[in-house]
Structure formats: structure tokens, C-alpha cells
Amino acid sequence: MVNPGPPGLIAGLLLAALSLSSVDGTKALGFVGHGYNMTVSQGHEAKLNCSLQGMEEPEIQWLKDGVPVQSADQMYIPVDEDHWISFLSLKNVERPDAGRYWCEAEHSGRKSVSDAIWVMVEGVPYFTLEPKDLSVTPNSPFNMTCAAVGPPEPLVIFWWVGDSPLGKSESSPSVLQIPGIRERTAFSCEAHNAKGVSSSRTAIVEVKGLPYPPFNVTISKVTGSTATVTWSPGFNSFSLIKSCTIQVQSLHGNREMYSRLTSVPPFAVVLDDLQPLTNHSVRVQCTNEMGASPFSEWITFNTKEKVPQLIPQNVHMTKTDSCLLLDWEDVDPDKEGYNILGFKVQWEQENTTQGELFVQENQANLTKWNPEKDLTIRICIANAAGCGPWSEFLLAGSKEEAGKQRHPHTRMSWVPMVLGILTALVTVVAMTLIFLRKGRKETRFGNMLGSMLGRGGPVIQFTAARSFNRRGPEVMEATLDSIGISDELKSKLKDVLIQQQQFTLGRTLGKGEFGSVREAQLKMEDDTMQKVAVKMLKAEIFCSSDIEEFLREAAFMKEFDHPNVCKLIGVSLRSRTKGRLPVPMVILPFMKHGDLHTFLLMSRIGEEPIALPIQTLVRFMIDICSGMEYLSSKNFIHRDLATRNCMLNEDMTVCVADFGLSKKIYSGDYYRQGCASKLPVKWLALESLADNVYTVHSDVWAFGVTLWEIVTRGQTPYAGVENSEIYSYLTAGNRLKQPPDCLDELYEMMCQCWITEPKRRPSFVDLKRRLEAIWGRLSILSASHDQLYVNLGETCGAAAAVSGLHSAFCKEEDYCAGPSQTCGTSAITSDYRYIVNPGCLREGNEWSSSAQNGEARGLLHEEEEEEEEEEMQEEQVVITL
């Protein structure tokens, strides 16, 4: 109970109530008194009351703007047995407390409503629109807008440019018109009213300029006629880079130069039609709306020698008793840059190569051959890269003086023909005998049935009650046609369908309520094995609609092609017994270093904690933002963006993964609201929590929470707040607090991602631009580049990422401990996610044994193995750090 007001107020109300009851002894149910207006200063206490008569022990409900007030600061005072006064106390009044209040009571189906009490909250001005960060061209006009509200009114706006006030006051809203600037400038505004002054955020206006020259120009995959050029763009000077120009200079004979324009990203291009065995030089420049950057430095490379694509022409042969003379049309040694060294002559007898001869002239003399047998000869042109296409076979008969060109394999041997005819005849005879025997076969009722049929009598009919097949249940063929999905989805998945015989399932990497992720070895076209991750739905909890939804999201992933978005390798179907739907599986790249959340967590609380530089964290943010920018450009809504769903690639770049699939696989961070599906509540935007609405703006909200996770190195957002309380917590105006050591610019960016109105949140394009600007300034200030080294030593396998990372960030040997020779372990009993790292998973030994077992069993596991998988979920997982 709280004190509802001064004793004099209570006494006066009691006296008024007593006087009313004395005037009329018969009291009808109803509220007495009149409504009134109340003005309260922000931060002070307000006390409201209403008086009800005509009911014993009433239930009086306070309402604000039609919504029941859930507050413990309410108190009842009885005047007599059927006359009561209710008090409502509002402590530390804020602007959301302003509104219309009244009381309601119900008795015998009749509702009574009091007059309204209007509460107005006065305080310092509140900004509804603040200046925003901009990037502008030099000396171009632009506007800045600032708006604030009271009460009390009126209020005025003052503008500041840097640390200097403009001195002119304007009413709200105020639009500041700037004719143009030439350098980076800060703008802010102040709002004044009778209660005080409020200051807006500081908006930074950057001046666009020419981009910096590209760097890290690299030449790879060089052949005789092609080469791949990749590069890193320089700082874009606050204007998006749209295209790059690659200049190629050839030093073949005379200097030849040509340029090639390509759109970006990706920052890579394949050069073709290059001269073989030639020195080339390459340089790159990139262009934004302000113009082109300076060129990068020249990078020199040599194309490889190309196999000649020429065939010897006009081959002639002269046969004598002791030798065979060959000659053909000569070829220029330097023709088309092939650097021809000579000719290779090969001869065969009875379909077996008898010898080879290399000559530099356009003639050859063969002496080592059997003149009693047919001889076939062919010739090719050769250089250091190899032998070109062979000429047609030249046939020299055993008694001919000169040959004529024909292919030796066109001769048809009579032996295979006879064998084929005999095989066909035997097959036809066997099939005829089988059908005849089957037609004459009768049951023990055959004679009786035959006589009845002859007389036109009734025929005995029966149906088998059950099958006594000893071979076990028949396996249903797993095809796209057998799972009941739409034709449109079939056509999308047809070219990425992988047969289940092409890969072998290994150990389980993670399990959840709706499915699991398993390691696997995929057999490639060149017979090599590639390690992949396989996601599959749990066998007993899905129907055909679940399969279609699962595979439809996989079809979306098929179209993705971006370095920061996890790309689909393929889909597969696991066969099951007839009558049961196949298990759908999605095949994804195996990310050696696991998910970003575990990496950040281990860097903070692992056995060897490391301090991640802010440049590295911002680089992670840029990677995620680039991936989300790409997804939003494809009109794809992620719905579950978080560090746990961002994977670390082998080169430590971040890839956005789990495109909506994770919402039905993992359940640890999800909350079921009523009977709806489980949701990642602490990452959801307000509109998603309230109306189940998902847009690119709700992904921006989740991106803000993801930034907070990265800055805090994997801490849980809204710690101490229950999932069921998140909506009330956010609607009350609360947000995640600024973490220690967090840049003000980063936290301002997070807060803008959490604006209540979705359309006022920044886009991923704008967020990426601002993050790149922050990273550019940090890179300039830093004395060293932000490189991330991962120690992949054999002691701990791929799992030595933490110790390697720890060493990489130490600048002096005297201040760094040497790498640990042993691996610590940390037992994690809860459900972990794909793929836990940094931490040692002992991939080498465990997988080899797992793969061998998989080879023996094949892909398909029998039904009893599903129970073993359930038991594995209960076991403790040991992660080596």
C-alpha cells in the first residue's frame, strides 16, 4: 500500500461521501463526482481517485485510454458498507502516462463508468525527428530537419554547426538549408520550452570524394589463354563503388593494351583471349559517382604455353620391303605462338601400340614393324605443353605399297556379332518358356473352377488378409515425384538434387526439437571427397507440407551467389519404408570455424581468452551487413538473423546462414507465443511480436541486436528479462544498453535499428556505408592491418583457432605466451549448434573412424538407428579448446 494523498484530502473526500449518503438513504449503483483535468510535471507523482456507491466490496477497475491499468499502486477506502473510494498513484510520471483515465465497476450485469480524468504531462521537449547522417557531394545544397514536441508549448529550435550556434531560433519542425560544404561537418539542434532544454543527436555529414586505388591485386588460375584477376576495393570515400576498369598490357611482339569494364561486386574478373606464353601486366581502377580512382600498381604475370590446336595435313606413306617412309605438310614453328618443337609419330598393330617416334622434321622412317600384319599410323604436333590433336589413322595393309586414310576401328569383327545374336536368341527362348509355364499353372481348385466357368456358375473370390513377406518392409523410392510437392518447386530443385549414394553421413553436429545437422562426406565428379554439412528434418514430425516448406527455402538458397551468404550445395532425399515419406536433406558447405556466437563466446570466456580488436569486430559487422544487403536486394526476408546463424569461413569471413530453416531446427533461443510457432523473441522487432509481421525492416531490427552481440563478445541480449516479458519491456521504451568500450557511433546505429516505426529504420545499404566509414577511419588510425590469423596446427587440428588467434593479435614476442601443446576441454551439456568452434573437435581421428563405419553401412540407416540418435542427444558433448 502507498499513501494515496495528504490526510486532509482523504478527510475531505470522506466528508463529502458521508454528506451524500445522509441526503439519500437509498443509494443507486453509480460513481459520484465529476471528471477533472490534471497537469503533472515529468518525474513527479500523480494521484487519481473515484468514488462508487451502491455496492458492497466492489471490484473497481482503472482504465487508461480503454486499456486496463496493471498497477499495484491502487487502494480502496470504505466510507460505509456500500460506499467506496478508489485511489490510483502514478509515480515518476513520464510522457507515456499522459491520457484519459476512468473507473469501471460491474454488478448484476450492469456496468457503471465514472467521469474521465485527463492527465497532461509537462516536461522538457521530446524529439520526434533528429538530424540524420548524410553523404553529400562537395558544394551541393542539402537540408537537415529537426522536430520536437511539448507540452508545455510553445518551443523553439536552435541549430548548431560543430561547436558554434547559428543564433537564429525557429519553430518546430525546423528545416536547416545548407548551401553546401567542402569538408566533414557536424550538425545538431536544441529544443527549448518553459521546462528546459533538450539536445538532439549529432549528425555527421560526410563529403563524397574519389575512391582510393584498389589494392591486393592478385592473379590466379593462369592457363595458356585465360587468367583470373581479383582485388580489394579501396576506401569508397562515402560513395558506393559501381564499376571497375581492368587494363591489360601484352608484351607479345609489340605492346598492346586494352581495357575491360566490369560491374562490382564481386571484385573479380576472368581475362580471356590472352596470347599463350606471353608476358602480361594488369592494373585496376574503380569508379563511384564522383569519378574514377587512381590505378593500382602494375601486376605482371606470364601465360602458360598452350597445347597446339593444329592437325598434321596431307600425310603420305611409301612402303618398301625394309622400311616405311612418311611425310606430311610442314608447319611454321612459331605459328600462332605455339612454339612447336616437333612431331610425334605413333603406330599400332592388332590394336596395340607398337612404338612412338619424335622427329623435328616433317618426315619419318619406320623400320621396327611386322610387315606381315596390318599397320595403322597417326601423327600429332607437339610442344613443351604437350601433344595436340592426332591425325586420322593411316592404314598400311600387309600387301599394299601405299595406304589410304581410314579409321581402323571401323572394321566390324564377326565374333562379337555372332555372340550378340546367340545371346538374344537364348533370352527370347527363356522368356517364352517362363510365360508358358506360368499360364499352365493351376491351384488345387483349378479343375473345379474350370468346370464352373464352363457351366457359367459363380466364381470364388477372396482377398489376402496379410502378407508373410520375410524380406522386410519394402523401401519407397525417394524422388521428387514421390513427396507430393508442386511442379514449380520440382523444376527449381531438379538440377541440385544429389543422389543419396553420393555421400556418407557422419557424426551428429547438432540436434534440436525439429531436426538435426550432421557431418558428411560428398563424392565429387572427380571422385574426390568433400566435407559438407547436412540438415535434415526429424523423421517422425513432418508431413508433405513441412517437406515442401523445407525444400522451398532450400530453393531460395539455390539462387544465392555472394561471398557473405552461405550457398546451397544441393538437396537430397533419404528413402524410408514404403508408405512413409522420404526424409528431406539440405546439403551446405562445412564451415570449419563454426558459428560466430561460439567464436565470440570462447574469445571472452574460453580457457585462453583473447582481446579481439575493434577493427575485427567491425569487419564481422560489415560482412553480415553485406550478406543481408544482398538478401534484401533479392526480396528475401531472413527472419532469424543472429550471431548463432552466422558462420565463420576458412578465411574468417562471415557468411549469413540458416535462411529461415533454423526456425524449425533449433529451439534454444525461441519462445512459443500461445499456439504459434517458436520464435527468436529477443531478436524480433516490435511489429513481429505484436502482429507476426516480417519485413526487411524487422531484419534491420535483428541486425541491431546482432551488432550488440558482436560488441559484447557473445553476451545474451536482455539478460534477466523473461521471453514472455520482452514485448512489455520494449513497448515501455526500453532498449539494450550501450556496452562498455562500444563506440558511440556503433551504439547510435543500433538504436536507429530499434526505432519503433519500421520505415524510419535505416536500410542495409546505409548501414553498410556507415560501417565501412567507421572501419576506414579505424584502419587509418591503426598502425597495423586488421588481419585474422588462425593456427591450424596438427596438435589440435582445426580447433586451434583460439590459440592461433591469440598469437596473431600479440604484437611483441615478449608479451605473448607460446602456443599451448595440449588442448583444454570444456564440457557442454546443453544443445550446441552447427558447428562449435573455436574449440578442438578432434576432426581427424573421429571422422576417419566415422567415415569408415559409414562406408560399411552406406548412407541409409535402418529404423532402429533412429533410437540411437535420440540417445546420442542426451550424451555430453566435449569440446576441446
Curated annotation (Swiss-Prot):
Membrane-spanning intervals of the chain: 415-435
Protein name: Tyrosine-protein kinase receptor TYRO3
GO molecular function: ATP binding; transmembrane receptor protein tyrosine kinase activity
Domain Ig-like C2-type positions: 29-114, 125-206
The keyword Nucleotide-binding is assigned to this record: yes
Species of origin: Xenopus tropicalis
Catalytic activity: L-tyrosyl-[protein] + ATP = O-phospho-L-tyrosyl-[protein] + ADP + H(+)
Gene assigned in the entry: tyro3
Signal peptide extent: 1-28
SUPFAM superfamilies named among the record's database cross-references: Fibronectin type III, Immunoglobulin, Protein kinase-like (PK-like)
UniProt-listed Gene3D superfamilies: Immunoglobulins (2.60.40.10), Phosphorylase Kinase, domain 1 (3.30.200.20), Transferase(Phosphotransferase) domain 1 (1.10.510.10)
Membrane topology field: Single-pass type I membrane protein
Post-translational modifications: Tyrosine phosphorylated upon receptor stimulation.
InterPro entries for this protein: FN3_dom, FN3_sf, Ig-like_dom, Ig-like_dom_sf, Ig-like_fold, Ig_I-set, Ig_sub, Ig_sub2
Positions on the Cytoplasmic side per record topology: 436-881
Pfam families to which the protein is assigned, alphabetical: fn3 (PF00041), I-set (PF07679), PK_Tyr_Ser-Thr (PF07714)
Residue numbers annotated as active site: 640 (proton acceptor)
Domain of life: Eukaryota
